[in-house]
Amino acid sequence: MKQANKMVIYQVFPRWFGNMKSSLVKNGSKVENGVGKFSDFTPVALSKIKELGTTHIWYTGVIEHATNTDYTAYQIRRDHAAVVKGNAGSPYAIKDYYDIDPDLADNVPDRMKEFESLVRRTHEAGMKVIIDFVPNHVARQYYSDAKMAYVRSEEHTSELQSHLM
């Protein structure tokens, strides 16, 4: 018998969900190894997840983190390769707490709108959203390009970073 108020959480890395590339090139780029997108969570996909009895989806790795992918064309600072874990980076090496991982968007400038759309689709499918981060676990080159003007934020610097520049 199913309990009335039991939470069932479905944890997922959006970068893996919907990624149809079966290759696994060591230190490969997102072109070589693929990457899932927010848009892969279609209403049909979300309804299938809901059918599992899911009440909440825990989207892991959605906050912008350090990566070796070059997004300077979108005014996103480049990370030094020596301080990035692999090419994709660790989703817990937060680069900007106020922004979304550009890898997960179909259109990088619209990444926040795409994430908001994902949240809306999830709610429309009858589930709640969880995202996570580790406080103070930041990338060596933390810099917010998306924070509100009134938010004071110091760039994260370290002795290692000064040697890399």
Task: For every predicted segment, state its role.
Residues E155-M165:
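Single conserved hydrophobic/aromatic residue that forms the stacking wall/gate
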Residues M1-K128, N136-S153:
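N-terminal structural segment of carbohydrate-active enzymes
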